[in-house]
From Swiss-Prot:
Belongs to the ATPase epsilon chain family. Mitochondrial membrane ATP synthase (F(1)F(0) ATP synthase or Complex V) produces ATP from ADP in the presence of a proton gradient across the membrane which is generated by electron transport complexes of the respiratory chain. F-type ATPases consist of two structural domains, F(1) - containing the extramembraneous catalytic core, and F(0) - containing the membrane proton channel, linked together by a central stalk and a peripheral stalk. During catalysis, ATP turnover in the catalytic domain of F(1) is coupled via a rotary mechanism of the central stalk subunits to proton translocation. The gene is atp16. The keyword Transport applies. GO terms for biological process: ATP biosynthetic process; proton transmembrane transport. GO terms for cellular component: mitochondrial inner membrane; proton-transporting ATP synthase complex. Keywords: Allergen, ATP synthesis, CF(1), Hydrogen ion transport, Ion transport, Membrane, Mitochondrion, Mitochondrion inner membrane, Transport. It is found in: Mitochondrion; Mitochondrion inner membrane. This is ATP synthase subunit delta, mitochondrial. The keyword Mitochondrion applies. F-type ATPases have 2 components, CF(1) - the catalytic core - and CF(0) - the membrane proton channel. CF(1) has five subunits: alpha(3), beta(3), gamma(1), delta(1), epsilon(1). CF(0) has three main subunits: a, b and c.
Length: 17
């Protein structure tokens, strides 16, 4: 996933899984 403005850290963490 590409990180959105809000909650970007969570999106990046999910993408690394």
């Amino acid at each position: 996933k590409i990180a959105n403005g809000s909650g970007s850290e969570q999106d990046i963490a999910e993408a690394k899984i």
